[in-house]
C-alpha cells in the first residue's frame, strides 16, 4: 500500500538566496492580490466568477505588464489561479452562505459586520504578515540536505531525519524571519497482517479539557495546556508591539504608515512564541497518538461538534478548546491506524456517552459541574469521563462487528442514534417502575 508523507525542514539560506526567496514569495503575493482584484471586478461586471482558464489568461497579461514576475518560475504563479478558483466557488456554497448570515446576525460593530460579510471570501495578502509560500509541483531536486528549485538554485536545509519515498511536491513557506520547506513524498508501507478483531485490546477514548484523554481501561492523559503556560509571556510581548512606533513616509503625495525596525523586531518575538506553542502542541499530539496506536489494536473515539462549542462558549473556554486540538488528535489517530493496520472507529456525535450509565444503560441528564456519574437506577458511581469512555468503547465494538470484513479498518458509527432513542425508552420505563 502506498501513502503520502510530508517532511518539514527549516531552510538555512545565505543572504543572496534569502533575497531570492523574498522576491519570489513577494511575486506570488503580488500576483494573488492582482487576481483577487480582477476576480472581484469580473464578478461585479458579469455576475459570475472567472473560470480557472480565464484567471490563467490574466496571469499572462500581468506578466507582460510587470516584468519582475518573469523572474519567478511559471508553475508557482499558475497555482494561484487554481487556488483562487477553488476559494471563489467554495465561498458560494450553501453552508458558507449560511455561516456568513449567522455571523452577520451576531455582528454588532461596523468592523464585525464587514468581517462577517467577507467570511470565506478570498482576501488580499499583506507583506507584513510574513507568511509567503512558493509551491512547486515539479522542477525540484532533493539531495544530501539540500533542495534545488528552478530560478533560485540549491538551498541547504537542517536535515533532522532521513527522507523516505519519492518526492512529489515541494512547498517553501515563510514563518516570520524563518523559512521552511515541506516535501511531500510517496512511500510504500510495509505489509502488516491485520490482527483478528478482539475486544481485549481495543480502547475507547473520551477527550476533555480538564483531562486530555480518559481511556476505557481507566488510564488518563493530562492536558498539557500549552497555550496557557505561554499566555502571560505572549500578552506581555503583544502589549509591547502597541508601544512601538510607526514611520510615516510620503509616496506620491500620500502619507504612508509603516512599521519601524523595533516594531518589526517585536512582531518577530511574538511570532516565535506562537511558533513554539504550535510546535509543542504538535509534538504532544504526535507522541500521544503514536502511543495509542502502538499500545492498542483498536481505537474508538466520538465525533465532537467543535464548531458549536466555539460558537456557544466564552472567550476563555474557546481558547482552551482551540488549544487542546481534539480534531487534529482524531486525524492523527485515524491515519496512523490506517498505516499500521489497526482498527479505528468514530461514533456519532449525538451518542449520549456522558449521560448513559455504563452498567445498566439508563440515561440521566448531567451538568458540566458534575464530575461523578451517579446512576439513579442501579446505583453505579463512577468518574463521568471514565463512564463515557466505557460507553464509547461498547458502541464502537458494535460498529466494528457490523462493519469488519465489509468496510475495512476504519468505520463510522451508524447505529448510535437508533440505540440512543431505544436507550431513552428503556430509561423512562426503568424510572417509571
Language-model-detected regions and their locations in the chain:
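Substrate-contacting helices/loops that form the catalytic groove of nucleic-acid
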Residues: 42-44, 48-65, 175-330, 402-433
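Secondary-structure transition/turn motif
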Residues: 146-156, 183-188, 217-219, 379
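Short acidic-glycine loop/turn motifs at beta-strand connectors
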Residues: 143, 175, 216-219, 360, ...
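Short polybasic amphipathic segments
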Residues: 144-150, 211-215, 371-374
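Acidic carboxylate diad motif detector
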Residues: 52-173, 323
